């Protein structure tokens, strides 16, 4: 198996990084008035401007060659074709099938999975309709007014992000809450908002054994039983799981269990039954629009030439910035308060997928892989960490996202928001030269000695890369496109880095150690296998809890 650093295009890009990669983007824009048209791409109403990167036609051509040499087209077809692309768990990777809106069959081991997917969707539609209409009643005959999703990781981050993003579409008399953290304070604060008679709990755990989720589910079960009695459980609990035995033992009627499949990774599961909270919040028709948006991006990703393919372009630009220009992180900056949970969602999607140090063939990688991801909605982030992005010593490319139209057109608020996002992208690219800074200070009437002192602090180096994603309005279809865009971007990069993007063994070791420490915290014995720091902390916790 050929590693990326051995590919001809990789070596070509290393040479280009020493030339084009160091050129001021100011000069590139000055020399090419058509740069925006040349380095932007569209899918329907979604516009990607990637012109504010240190690229030219030669760099982009080399990046596309890199994708070809790394086997991206074949890998893409293998994933969509249901092959066991998750090599360490020997599983297909078919979250795309969950949003397949075509009549195409999707085979896994020779079996078309679409009939099963459609059957689950039909059950979700029926259930969501009954709850939203008031037909589904709690144990005392009152309709449901609060939904509490209990899950963690992919069973939480995706549904939380989507329900927050689609708040303008939510049913006014149905509140949707989420409990994820095993910290009891999370459950306690959510339960304060709920009336037991009108609350429906969704327990989201594929195996129904996830420690945090089951602990929270038991707490919520005890809360309900205390108020309404054991017989109330079937009317107030449903499960998203494949473990019917454990679900039944918990007291949930397995007729109210919605299943999914082992080829659905947690961080890709919002499209599955895990999205039930989304369907309850915004209605099943809106959930279908979300699926349709994801499917539209799937078709684009599968059918569009690499050089005009939005996920491929985003992925390749990320490779260029990370592996050739030295960026260890990138910032996701949605200028949309409804997308305030998008950075956290993309942290899991990107860092859990591509935070790997082992190649698909088992070799230790000698090249950079997944970057760190962080972000905040604009304009809040401008008053927090943008200082480092503008004038710090680390290169941090940015993805800006913005809708041209607001769901809440209050005065000039949205124009102010848009002016800020466009200004930030321009400022990062242009920077401010010493001459420009001097002219500003002189115009302000500053004396020469003070100017000499202040000048180095007022210069912005610029040449900071960014992408801008612009769309008319954030609706379910557009949100589906954006989520699938980033999913496929992560896939592209994982293929080029030659890593497995669909496992997450790194989360397992801590779980195992936590089980042992849990037992020790409630006893007086400390295992001799711990290092002195961990043993000391265990003893300190015991003393503080006495």
Swiss-Prot record:
Top EC group: isomerase
A GO cellular component entry from the record: cytosol
Residue numbers annotated as active site: 352, 383, 511
Gene Ontology MF term list: carbohydrate derivative binding; glucose-6-phosphate isomerase activity; monosaccharide binding
UniProt-listed GO biological process terms: gluconeogenesis; glucose 6-phosphate metabolic process; glycolytic process
Homology family: Belongs to the GPI family.
Protein name (Swiss-Prot/TrEMBL): Glucose-6-phosphate isomerase
Native source organism of the sequence: Paramagnetospirillum magneticum (strain ATCC 700264 / AMB-1)
Gene: pgi
